[in-house]
Amino acid sequence: MTAATENRTVRRNGPGTKRADWNNWSPLAFEEMDSALNIQQYIQQTIKANPADVATILTPPLDQDEGVWKYEHLRQFCIELNGLALLLQRECIPETCQQMTATEQWIFLCAAHKNPNECPAIDYTRHTLDGAATLLNSNKYFPSRVNIKEISISKLGSVARRVYRIFSHAFFHHRKLFDEFENETHLCKRFTTYVSKYNLMQQEHLIVPILPNQQQQQQTTVQ
Amino acid sequence: MEDASQLSNSQNDKAKDETTRPQYTMSGILHFIQHEWTKNELDRTRWEAERAEMQARIAFLQGERKGQENLKQDLVRRIKMLEFCLKQERAKNYRLTHNGEEPPSLEESPNENSAPSENSHLTADLDAYINDAGEAGGSFRQGRLLLKRYLEEIGYSEHIMDVRSFRVKNLLGLLPQADLPSSERLNGRKEKSDSNYSDSDDGHDDAALDADASKAFEEFDFLNNMDAKEKGSDDDWAGKGASFEKLIKQYKDDPKVKRRSRTSTEESEEKTSNDVQKNLETDVPPGIRSAIDAAAQEELPVRRQGRRSANFGYGNGNELDVALGMQDNDNMDIKDEFKDEDDDPNAQQVKWNIKVTLRSHLDSIRAMQFHPVEPVLFTASEDGLIKLWNLDQKKDEKHNSGGTELEPVYTFRGHKGPVLCLVLSPTGDHLYTGGIDGNICCFNVPSSNGDPFDSYDPRVLTETLTGHTDAIWSVAYHSSNSRLVSASSDSTVRLWEPGNGEPLIRTIGAPKSGILPTSVDFVSTETSHLLAAYTNCYAQIIDIDTGSTVMVFDFGAVTGSPTMNKIVSHPTMPLTLIGGEDRTIRYFDNTNGSIIHEAIAHVEGVSSLAIDPNGLYLLSGSHDGSIRMWNMEKRSCLQEISAHRKKNDSAVTSVAFHPSRSLIGSAGADSLAKVYVSGSN
Ligand SMILES: [Zn+2]
Ligand SMILES: [Zn+2]
């Protein structure tokens, strides 16, 4: 092998990589990411750098196509939400959470079934995440990760709306678990910022008071 | 520039309500162009992959077409032959009724004794024979032409049959192969014995292939017997056939023309196969050699036979041409076809074509394995999930997924963060997965026909084996005592017994400080031995009963200290294969730890290896994005498929053979898994 190739940083988590060294390579400028999955790489790189820096994570590279940007972020949310689902598997059981609820105002029906079903919370969580993975991989709506069809963008909103209920259920029913997860990942904060920034959800549906302005709002309503 | 500004205009129109960005920055335009270029490049690679697939398909269909045309021609010629026969009978009748006018050589009485006298005449003088033909009229000449074609035809169709059976054998590699050549032979004979000329064929075969003389003589005898039974009323034709045969033999005995018909291709082919044999004899230790020889004996006769029959058809034409004083004419095109088929290495190879792309994971897939029996696949991904796929799944209308694509039947959740490896129990009932979280999850495998949106059953995850303090990169299952081995970047290899109260049985540290285990597999020929590969170009055999090193593989001189990514045991031989980050695949002899063979196999690091259940084919996957199918015996590459796109510098991460079906799979950093079927499906 030539010296040039050897000197090049190989960004690869090969077998034997320690957990601490996972994705632990010098960051690459977005312009230099020449793979087709550069947006996913870029998003994961900025998260790795600092998961709490939501603003930076959600700042697209210059002139980035917004559809792909939104799409890849939603993929990333679904990946990380698997972590929350794993935690919920521990204590969110049908005996205690017979329905998918957050506040008592709504019971959410699971849309993974042909006829929306009143699944227990843990099943709602699993079904919704599995359904989201299927939809985001659908050849019909998202045949390419480089180019998102305009008509498919609307699907992002419905996926976002459904997976958000997992946050809200965890927040209102498994608060300790939610905090444990949120402190590590800042995922709900990032998600709320994301759907607000791209108008994927209506503000009144964002019921987990995670952003400073939401907390203020809640306080004012309480008062 | 105009184009660029237009494009950025339109972009801006879209984004106008969002923000007011500088409209035409140079970097913006450049980036746009770069972006477009990347897109085009991507499309191009995809199109190229599709093109390659289509070409393989076309080649296969063309082969099919040739076979069909050939069959048609064969039937037409048979009809013509019967017509010719009838004409001959009429001519004979005429001659008998006009006795004296005809030369004695063509005077044929209906009884069998006439044949020898005719033979003696024919063998005496070639010219006389041709004159006879001239006197007998154009129909006789035409008949010989037909005969010649027909003989070629037999060779050709036999060749086609060989190609097919070879292909089938190749792709199956799963069927008892020893049967194939013999059954094929029988088919060939059947076809030959359908014809009255068969004895002349085989006589020719005998003479041309003196190496196989004795075997061919047996065939000859056998066919003569068969023919004798079948002759009946066609006696005179049989007689003519015999005379041809004598004529050909005489011709071949002529030193000037002897062997001229043997083409150089056959000689070189035989030479290479001899070389291969020789290499095997010198390179391979005795234990392995016998096994390889056994494999080779299954393999080679078919190839040789195919080669021989092609040549046979070829030579037949040539020699008959000369013997019968004919020039090459309209048969040229057939010969060209022979040649093409011979020269084109693809014609005799199995081609794997993509059957289905499995899209459901959201991040790089790290590992895949097929169910031992069912058309079922398991994939483990960095998205933290393991998915079960039923490749025969009927589209279920119950689900609101909006697509017609294959969806996973079950999704396993048990790991926090990426899942890096998985292994199934030999029955396919239990699944063991290792993750970056340092845990091993033991799952009961749910029904592959279940409802993907069934309610959660916590009993699916039966146990979590904790103890490793860092990522688990490889798990292997011991088929006979239900034990599990794991390799972790905490530098240890651990032996577990799931279901036991104290599942951890043994911890085996790294043989040297600073090296980490990467991959483990059990030795197929010695069940208490474990293969372990490490970073820093190290691999060894460990006795799992004692935890001690049995053998350290000798890598010889290696530049740098590349990580050995994947270690696999040959299914039947004491042979170990290791794929390395240095792009190399190495074959080791377990008996002495020495390298049998090493070769750079890919453009970038080899990430994964899989061997078919019979140990004849090797599948390798690499970060260059391709998977390659290898002939293990010849170590030649049979096919390359560009399979997966890169994420960072990773591409193909895992490859697999189905243990009992003609399916292979690949998985990659692009979150996709692909399943391929062999070309004939
Ligand atoms: Zn719950
Ligand atoms: Zn449901």
From Swiss-Prot, chain A:
Membrane topology term: Peripheral membrane protein
Binding residues for Zn(2+): 92, 97, 169, 174
Annotated InterPro entries: MOB_kinase_act_fam (IPR005301), MOB_kinase_act_sf (IPR036703)
Region (Disordered): 1-23
Statement: the UniProt record of this protein carries the keyword Zinc: yes
One CC-aspect GO term: Golgi cisterna membrane
Domain of life of the source: Eukaryota
Subcellular location: Cytoplasm, Perinuclear region; Membrane; Golgi apparatus, Golgi stack membrane
Family annotation (SUPFAM superfamilies): Mob1/phocein (SSF101152)
Swiss-Prot/TrEMBL keywords: Cytoplasm, Golgi apparatus, Membrane, Metal-binding, Transport, Zinc
A GO term, aspect molecular function: metal ion binding
Matching PANTHER family: MPS ONE BINDER KINASE ACTIVATOR-LIKE MOB
Record function comment: May play a role in membrane trafficking, specifically in membrane budding reactions.
Protein family per UniProt: Belongs to the MOB1/phocein family.
Stated name of the protein: MOB-like protein phocein
Source organism: Caenorhabditis elegans
Lineage summary: Eukaryota, Metazoa, Ecdysozoa, Nematoda, Chromadorea
